[in-house]
Each structure stands twice: as structure tokens, then as C-alpha cells.
């Protein structure tokens, strides 16, 4: 029988490989020449040498090693914060799966494979599925952490009133 930490690790790994696999499959299609143009969104191939909005692109090849250190450091931290990891295994799986996929791009292609270009009314940075999964994972984690804790504290307060 698996304990809760082992179950959380399995959930984390499942989400990790799902996000990683979907992202790499989409990027493969883009690299093979898939493109799309419309009035709102274009699918175009761009190699991003930096991070969000091409920041830190001046680090060039060193950026991928910095990102590996950050990913490993965060993973080690989470393995020591078992309650945080167990309660947010899905979100962390999303963030890590997407992050590792983007780092792999840096090693294989020299930059992150970006392709979604939103340009209706204004030009937005070109991004990819992994970027969206990182944003969604962090957003859900913050919402759950903030609202769940507030709700839990209110319930504890109400329970202590009736004791």
C-alpha cells in the first residue's frame, strides 16, 4: 500500500510526463513546419534565447544551466516540504513538466521553441504550451494556497467558538 507521499509523487510524475509529452509533441509539429495565420493568433516558429519576454537572453548558453539549478533546487526544497508537495502535486507537476520541457529545448535547439503569437489589438510576446502550463500551475497553486488556507482558518475559528 502506498503512503500519501508516494501517491503524491505518482500524481506529480503523471502530470509531469503528460505536460512534458504534450509540449514536446506540439513543438515537434511546429518544428516540422506546421503554421497557422489569422487575424487574432498566428502559429509561427521562434527560438527564444531568453526567458519570459526574452529577458536574460544575454546569458546565452549559461541560462540553461541556471534554470537546471533552479529546477533542482526547487525540487529538493519540495521534497523537504512534504505537506506543501502533497497538497499541490498536480500544480508542481505542471510547472516542472513545462519547465523541464523548455530547458530541454535550450539544449536541443539552442533556445526555447515558442510559437503562439497573439496580435489582436496589440502585439503580445510569443509563447508556447509550456509557458501557459507554468502560468496555470502557479496561478492555481497560489489561489488554492491563499483561499484554502483562509477558508480553513475560518472553519477552525468557528469550531473553536463552539467548543
Curated annotation (Swiss-Prot):
Annotated localization: Cell inner membrane
Entry annotated with the keyword Cell membrane: yes
Gene Ontology MF: a single term: aspartic-type endopeptidase activity
Name listed for the protein in its UniProt record: Lipoprotein signal peptidase
Gene name linked to the record: lspA
InterPro entries cross-referenced by the UniProt entry: Peptidase_A8
Biological or metabolic pathway of the protein: Protein modification; lipoprotein biosynthesis (signal peptide cleavage)
Alphabetical GO biological process terms: proteolysis
PANTHER family per UniProt: LIPOPROTEIN SIGNAL PEPTIDASE (PTHR33695:SF1)
Phylogenetic placement of the source organism: Bacteria, Pseudomonadati, Campylobacterota, Epsilonproteobacteria, Campylobacterales
Keywords noted in UniProt: Aspartyl protease, Cell inner membrane, Cell membrane, Hydrolase, Membrane, Protease, Transmembrane, Transmembrane helix
Entry keyword annotation includes Cell membrane: yes
Reported function: This protein specifically catalyzes the removal of signal peptides from prolipoproteins.
Pfam families for this protein: Peptidase_A8
NCBIfam families given in the database record: lspA
Coiled-coil blocks: none
Principal subcellular localization: membrane
Bilayer-crossing regions: 10-30, 36-56, 58-78, 84-104, 122-142
Paired cysteines (S-S): none
Domain of life, per lineage: Bacteria
Amino acid at each position: 500500500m502506498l503512503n500519501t507521499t508516494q501517491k503524491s509523487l505518482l500524481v506529480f510524475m503523471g502530470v509531469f510526463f503528460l505536460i512534458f509529452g504534450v509540449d514536446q509533441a506540439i513543438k515537434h509539429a511546429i518544428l516540422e513546419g506546421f503554421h497557422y495565420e489569422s487575424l487574432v493568433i498566428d502559429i509561427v516558429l521562434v527560438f527564444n534565447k531568453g526567458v519570459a519576454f526574452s529577458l536574460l537572453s544575454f546569458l546565452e548558453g549559461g541560462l540553461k544551466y541556471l534554470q537546471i539549478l533552479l529546477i533542482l533546487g526547487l525540487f529538493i526544497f519540495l521534497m523537504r516540504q512534504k505537506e506543501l508537495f502533497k497538497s499541490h502535486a498536480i500544480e508542481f507537476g505542471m510547472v516542472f513538466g513545462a519547465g523541464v520541457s523548455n530547458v530541454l529545448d535550450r539544449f536541443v535547439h539552442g533556445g526555447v521553441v515558442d510559437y503562439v503569437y497573439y496580435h489582436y489589438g496589440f502585439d503580445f510576446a510569443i509563447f508556447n504550451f509550456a509557458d501557459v502550463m507554468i502560468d496555470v500551475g502557479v496561478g492555481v497553486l497560489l489561489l488554492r494556497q491563499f483561499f484554502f488556507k483562509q477558508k480553513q482558518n475560518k472553519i477552525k475559528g468557528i469550531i473553536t467558538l463552539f467548543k
